[in-house]
Amino acid sequence: MRPVTKLLITVISGFYLACLLMPGLEEHLYLNRYLVLNLGEYWRLLTVALTHGGIMHLFFNMYALLILGNSLESAIGQKKFLAIFLISQIGASLASIYFSAFNVVSVGASGAIFGLFGALIVVSKRYGLDTKQTYVIIGINFAIGFIFPGIDWRAHLGGLIAGFIAASVLLSPTRS
């Protein structure tokens, strides 16, 4: 397992466990439009990735992070990978708070994971690889987000766009 991928999985999983052991901790981490825009709790744009709605939510996100993280981190390096992950999470959070109601609470790292899919598209195109499977996986995940209530598809879309843009900029030939 690549070092930054391992670190992210360890920290996110550790916070999930901490939230189980310390009731009320999650309330200081999750994303909510009112808390960010009206109370200035901007840390939530990133800390939302440390929270999850259950063990299966955590498992699926960490599995996706493991698969995408190892591949991308190997291809683009630790610093750029971490930058894309964090930028994607911020983009996901901004999309969520600007396009959701004030009372909506959002949890999870899936916005950042979708950002990694956006980065994977950029990397795949750069190396002339087929992107059809990536588009299919993204489409299936968006469909799930529309079918099942409580999934923040706005964050997924924001993360995907932010990851694509971040990778396009960070991996441009003049920056590489």
What is each residue range found by the language model?
Residues 24, 97-98, 128, 164, ...:
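Membrane-embedded alpha-helical segments of multi-pass transporters/permeases
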Residues 74-79, 83, 120-135, 171-176:
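Alpha-helical transmembrane bundle and helix-membrane interface signal
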Residues 1-4, 10-13, 132, 142-176:
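C-terminal transmembrane module of polytopic alpha-helical membrane proteins
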Residues 97-115, 119-123, 127-128, 145, ...:
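Transmembrane helix-loop-helix hairpins at the membrane interface
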Residues 1-107, 148-151:
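N-terminal TM1-TM2 helical hairpin plus the immediately adjacent luminal interfacial "cap"
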Residues 58-65, 107-119, 152-171:
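Alpha-helical transmembrane segments that form the membrane-embedded catalytic/substrate-binding core
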Residues 87-88, 133-142:
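Central hydrophobic cores of alpha-helical transmembrane segments
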